């Protein structure tokens, strides 16, 4: 396989593709990961940007397009939301109000618009969003088919560190793997990908195209993505934002805690690193640390069977009589209401 660079698109991101040659005897899927920044606190403008990027990817023949974690709604990098042990500041509460206002309801008008985009450009779409459920927010991935249907969602089950003060915890009811004409598609978000039991649950559902929207641009992230591809015998598509300080509101409205004085408008605060990896652990496209980009590869689905001949983690390489996993895949609510179907009426005597 040879990495074939495509000339840069005017006023658009770099695009790269993998040439699979003419000898593949199995179906191929052209997949694109989007590396781009949210327009922070401006969800309508971010949706416009998402459509532009989706249209560009589709023009290159993409059948599946994966966006980064929290692309709609934004990843509040560097913010503390005014929190310390035993104290929340008024400024931090106002910051949360604005962040809450930038989130989207699922279902809701923004979901309908994303579905229409997927149908318009005839692509399967995996989109990272901040979901608003009343006054609780979730870091969520939405799935859409190429006919413009909303398939469902995955809520991040374990936010990391300070994310836990702004995002709720997903439960086992939203760990889907969708059987599509392109293959079986699912997603885990950022450091969820370091949770062996969650990965095992997805492998057990037969995942073939493993999407990993993230906010981690460190070099070590690539090792995790390669490991998952080898462990699961699946394609791994990791999409991250590429952000500069100027992509966030300026101070004092938005402050990168502890580092603001060291930043210029052009300082890189998230360097991307989006990548596509094959089931054999080969890097098909990326990682890109240069700027906003569309990163694409043609996925030879025959690679999955070839990889699983060596190692099938929930098949011939499993030992269920020694090691097994229980997944509670039902929704959990803090409040349950029960009532009788009818109330007996007493007759006056």
From Swiss-Prot:
Entry keyword annotation includes Lyase: yes
Keywords, sorted A to Z: Cell membrane, Hydrolase, Lyase, Membrane
Query: Where does the record place the CN hydrolase domain?
Result: 29-301
Q: Which reaction does it catalyse?
A: a nitrile + 2 H2O = a carboxylate + NH4(+); 3-cyano-L-alanine + 2 H2O = L-aspartate + NH4(+); L-asparagine = 3-cyano-L-alanine + H2O
According to UniProt, the tissues expressing it are described as: Expressed in roots, stems, cotyledons, leaves and flowers.
- Where is it located? Cell membrane
* Signal peptide stretch: none
Q: Which InterPro entries does this chain map to? A: C-N_Hydrolase, C-N_Hydrolase_sf, Nitrilase/CN_hydratase_CS, Nitrilases_CHs
Question: What would be an example GO MF term here?
Answer: 3-cyanoalanine hydratase activity
- Cellular component terms per the entry's GO annotation: plasma membrane
Q: What does this protein do?
A: Highly specific for beta-cyano-L-alanine (Ala(CN)). Low activity with 3-phenylpropionitrile (PPN). Not associated with auxin production but may be involved in cyanide detoxification.
Q: What is this protein called?
A: Bifunctional nitrilase/nitrile hydratase NIT4A
